[in-house]
Amino acid sequence: MKKSILTAFYGGTFDPIHNGHIKSAIALAKLIHLNRIILIPNGSPVHKPIPVASAEDRINMINLAISEISEDIFEIDYREINNKIPSYTINTFENLRKEYGPKAPLGFILGQDSFMKLHTWYRGYDILKFCHLLICARSNNMINLKKIKFKFIDPKILHYIPFGLIYYAFTPIIKISSRNIRLRYKFGISCNGLISSSVQKYINKKNIYKR
């Protein structure tokens, strides 16, 4: 069986991108030996409220955040944020599979909380027909592995098989949320340590979350 390097995609509203996004992604990259994580910011998310920050501001904040870290593994895919209609994850991965071909290993990074709601997504579990699911821990409450027919696998296998596996990554628990950061800005509470310094300056300069 021939090994190919797994390409991982990390979708989200990133409103704003914060240290939890970055640190959990880097931790996952080290666990499963990723050298490429492609961020896919949502345009009009189906399962979340309309973003507060504009598409342009969210893209600028992502670029600022990833420019501050030493790991050169992050890229941005603009397909969803440039889409004028709501984007479904299944459609994105159908297109990615066509672009990368049938044999390329692809992975979708999502938090434990999002994974537990996957059954509510449009064709949520069909995503496994196109990529692996890479689950990052979000709390100390462990997923009921038997209930979801979860199997622990050697992460090396993710680089040999193109799709269909679920991997639970014991990444550090980082209790940060974009919603909490927006509320902090609204009420004038410091966000030091939660987002990068350049993103903080950008938010303050444009007064994004105090409107």
Swiss-Prot record:
**UniProt keyword annotation of Nucleotide-binding present:** yes
Q: Which residues form a coiled coil?
A: none
Which key words are in the record?
A: ATP-binding, NAD, Nucleotide-binding, Nucleotidyltransferase, Pyridine nucleotide biosynthesis, Transferase
- Classification via Pfam families: CTP_transf_like
Q: Tell me a GO biological process for this protein.
A: NAD biosynthetic process
Q: What metabolic or biological pathway is this protein involved in?
A: Cofactor biosynthesis; NAD(+) biosynthesis; deamido-NAD(+) from nicotinate D-ribonucleotide: step 1/1
Q: Which family does it belong to?
A: Belongs to the NadD family.
State its role: Catalyzes the reversible adenylation of nicotinate mononucleotide (NaMN) to nicotinic acid adenine dinucleotide (NaAD).
- Protein name as catalogued: Probable nicotinate-nucleotide adenylyltransferase
Chain's gene name: nadD
